[in-house]
Curated annotation (Swiss-Prot):
Keywords: ATP-binding, GTP-binding, Nucleotide-binding, Nucleotidyltransferase, Transferase. One of its GO terms (molecular function) is GTP binding. It is an enzyme of class 2 (transferase). The keyword Signal does not apply. The keyword Acetylation does not apply. It comes from the Bacteria. Residues 171-174 are annotated as: G4. GTP binds at residues 37-44, 116-120, 171-174. Heterodimer composed of CysD, the smaller subunit, and CysN. This is Sulfate adenylyltransferase subunit 1. Residues 95-99 are annotated as: G2.
Length: 478
């Protein structure tokens, strides 16, 4: 059955006009989710089916889809819905996803942003990028193959990146005659594996056929034994609470906004908490306090702002604030740290080894860090830990970092913005890894260690003539 995009027109009619429709859209909740799993599990086809069955495809897209489906012949006489998502020529030729593709759609209940991520192991870094902003992950399992290594890998990465809602979709049920026993077996297999994952996960299971649309947006008549919700019903009903509103205030300064001599504000996106006019705030790491005089936006001043809003704060005092500083509530007693344990997803061909130094970007702040040691690498298939000397491409491990300056940090599980970082190669300026702060450590350089004059002179010479070694000032400077 071919559907054309009359969904928006119908919603406008139901709402009573364009203005009422736009107002309703602004107040809909947003769900960001990704599809992941092993190669050829049907991730792109599933997204294409969701777009098709929710009437998000225009007539010209359908015409092109018919033409491309016949030309490629990948699904016989049926539409190859994966072509709606696989945009790269290499993806279409190989029938796989390489890049992370984003798609947007909405229903009467909710707005959605989908990230279609690659299944191949060599593109795990792309999958991690897609998962970093999502609230829910759909893990596809091929009904002919079951739980595979890449399924376990993606489950681990998704939970590592803070995703707590998982939907395990057993796809291609049409190829196993819609047998309930197959679905139940894979459900038990995944639950056995999930015992090694965090205990606070919300896991749901849906049997479906993305190619034919069974249990995607409408119930399947061929699987009467399944009485649960369809995939779309799960996506519309999952409770994604914006916990960042209840968290302490975090406002990373992105730049100083000074268009003229009469205005000075500090621009950025509010990461967590609520900021209000008249609220006393503290600037970190300096510790200077002031009061919020105005909250400026493009559409005018606000009396308060919440997480995700791009704002400019004007303070009552002339305070020395620069890019990378963090504004928090004045009652906060945060301590800066110079060492931290960081979960790392490595994304470069050249492995990560102890002793190397990298540029680090975290919440608008750019600094430098040295890899003190690699505590272990996670074996994804078994989720066991093993001691290694280096972390290879797509490797995930726990690393101790020593920063060149004290930083105010949160754990990633508490705040993705102030607890997440990227590693940048200092020579090529290429992003080579992603880091998730697990906890801060008391720096060994904060101890009252006494050094001899020779040690201090040698340290100064090394830092002056061999800066690429990443040696740190023994007196605690940069």
């Amino acid at each position: 059955m071919i559907l054309q995009n009359n969904s928006i027109a119908q919603q406008i009619a139901n709402e009573g006009g364009v203005e009422a429709y736009l107002h309703a859209q602004q107040h809909k909740t947003m769900l960001r989710f990704l599809t992941c799993g092993s190669v050829d599990d049907g991730k792109s086809t599933l997204i294409g089916r969701l777009l098709h069955d929710t009437r998000q495809i225009y007539e010209d897209q359908l015409t092109t889809l018919h033409t491309d489906s016949k030309r490629l012949g990948t699904q016989g006489e049926k539409l190859d819905l994966a072509l709606l998502v696989d945009g790269l020529q290499a993806e279409r030729e190989q029938g796989i996803t390489i890049d992370v593709a984003y798609r947007y759609f909405s229903t009467e209940q909710r707005k959605f942003i989908i990230a279609d991520t690659p299944g191949h192991e060599q593109y795990t870094r792309n999958m991690a990028t897609g998962a970093s902003t999502c609230d829910l992950a759909i893990l596809l399992i091929d009904a002919r193959k079951g739980v595979l290594d890449q399924t376990r890998r993606h489950s681990f990465i998704a939970t590592l990146l803070g995703i707590r809602h998982l939907v395990v979709a057993v796809n291609k049920m049409d190829l196993v005659d819609y047998q309930e026993s197959v679905f139940e077996q894979f459900k038990q297999d995944y639950l056995s594996f999930a015992q090694q994952l965090p205990t606070d996960l919300d896991i749901k299971f849906v049997p479906l056929s993305a190619l034919d649309g069974d249990n995607v947006a409408s119930p399947s008549e061929k699987m009467n034994w399944y009485s649960g919700p369809t995939l779309l019903e799960v996506l519309e009903s999952v409770d994604v609470v914006n916990a960042s509103r209840q968290q302490p205030l975090r406002f990373p300064v992105q730049y100083v906004n000074r268009p003229n001599l009469d205005f000075r504000g500090y621009a950025g996106t509010l990461s967590a908490g609520i900021v209000r006019v008249g609220q006393k705030i503290k600037v970190l790491p300096s510790g200077v306090e002031s009061t919020v005089a105005r909250i400026v936006t493009f559409d005018g001043d606000l009396t308060q702002a919440g997480p995700g809003e791009a704002i400019t704060l004007v303070l009552t005092d002339e305070v020395d604030i620069s890019r990378g500083d963090l504004l928090v509530d004045a009652s906060e007693t945060l301590q800066a740290a110079q060492n931290a344990l960081v979960d790392v997803v490595w994304m470069a061909e050249q492995p990560l080894v102890a002793g190397q130094s990298y540029d680090i970007k975290i919440a608008g702040k750019k600094t430098r860090a040295r890899v003190e040691n690699i505590q272990y690498q996670v074996e994804i298939n078994s989720l066991t830990q093993r001691v290694v000397e280096s972390l290879p491409l797509n490797g995930i491990g726990l690393v101790e970092l020593a920063f060149d300056e004290p930083l105010v940090l949160d754990s990633y599980q508490r705040n993705r913005d102030t607890g997440g970082m990227i590693f940048i190669d200092r020579l090529s300026n290429v992003t080579v890894g992603a880091g998730l702060i697990r906890e801060t450590l008391e720096s060994v350089y904060q101890e009252n260690t006494e050094f001899s004059a020779f040690e201090l002179e040698l340290n100064a010479l090394v830092r002056r003539h061999f800066p690429h070694w990443g040696a740190r000032d023994l007196l605690g400077g940069k």
